[in-house]
């Protein structure tokens, strides 16, 4: 939790860090990724058979090594909008017998050369957990049950045996399953009303948890503060008594919300992720309201929020049907840093967050035939995923604030926008980690930092100006490591992200 006191421009800023005040445990799944059959994410990104940089499975080795640097804990698959017409059975078995299908989300052709077994094997090579999204567009409950049985079944059943026939004896034990993707959207095949979806999701969840009670189910929400989110939570957040047990089984483990932010001007761009912070706060209250109104027993585990699509994305600048290949600048990197600060600050409520996407498609990581490019947005992800773990701890900032335009406009009325955006953690290793993002375009900010004593390791991400990118053959934005003796105030450079790290 970070609190804020607004100062005048003439007053001296300060930051106080309190490692003894632990707020909540951080779920490492907030650093999850996403791989959709869209653009060059799968074909030419994750999977590139015949390329000298690929292994015997066709997996790009340089992509695997890069994602290992990010310690990605979970990858969502196969979409996204793609899931609404995807039939998993097309993507298993001998490749020469897999059908090519028209793909209606991004208007391409899906060859099905990369499917369930390839993805789950790729996850094992990467060392990450899979998160599969069920087709609640053209798909059926029988198809969903079959997919769970194919992945997780241990009995002598048709689909578990089909998995064995296809070369995988042991179950994959896929834990996370989404009940559809953005089924409320007018762009979806088989768009649903909230009433239709809530009824369907409830019935599907019962059946899926009867088949495999160990799985966790993610409800399809909208942006969070909407009537869709309230209604679907209210209608599905009920204890269900299994005929096999007298204990109450929670149907819904997480509630999914999505949001993308972007603006052509720097300051509206870097303050836009605060809309996500307010969305999390409201969604958390809706979860509590549904539990209260439905009389859910307090001992039943409270669902968390699964922010399983988030990023900086301007769909005009990077059109989805054309592969959505963004060229990110320093301003976008700082916006991603603010997004990640939000997830750390709200760790009590966020059980998972998946940046969309992990390779090539609005991604921090781009591939060419000859290698990879780490975009500006790579560096905040790298720092957070490697250091901002453990516990969220209390921090207080005193600084002046940006008072101009926000995007969306309603952010101005509901969130403070200080010049310094801050989150703080205490790791299991006993180190305090503090991220400070100076969003000011033109001015470094000198602030007294209460908390550290002795040597402080400092990581800084910045560049010549907010518009510089790494996509023009030169790395304009990277990572610089220095040391600081913690004497006197610290100057946070203009348009920069700084991570300070010291032993508590």
From Swiss-Prot:
Positions in coiled-coil regions: none
Organism: Emericella nidulans (strain FGSC A4 / ATCC 38163 / CBS 112.46 / NRRL 194 / M139) (Aspergillus nidulans)
The protein's role, per its UniProt record: Alpha-L-arabinofuranosidase involved in the degradation of arabinoxylan, a major component of plant hemicellulose. Acts only on small linear 1,5-alpha-linked L-arabinofuranosyl oligosaccharides.
EC number, as in UniProt: 3.2.1.55
SMART domains: Alpha-L-AF_C
Keywords: Carbohydrate metabolism, Glycoprotein, Glycosidase, Hydrolase, Polysaccharide degradation, Secreted, Signal
Gene Ontology MF, one: alpha-L-arabinofuranosidase activity
Matches recorded under InterPro entries: Alpha-L-AF_C, Glyco_hydro_b, Glycoside_hydrolase_SF
GO cellular component, one term: extracellular region
Catalysed reactions listed for this entry: Hydrolysis of terminal non-reducing alpha-L-arabinofuranoside residues in alpha-L-arabinosides
Pathways involved: Glycan metabolism; L-arabinan degradation
Protein name (Swiss-Prot/TrEMBL): Alpha-L-arabinofuranosidase C
Residues of this chain annotated as glycosylated in UniProt: 81, 152, 269, 329
Main location: secreted
Any single biological process term in GO: pectin catabolic process
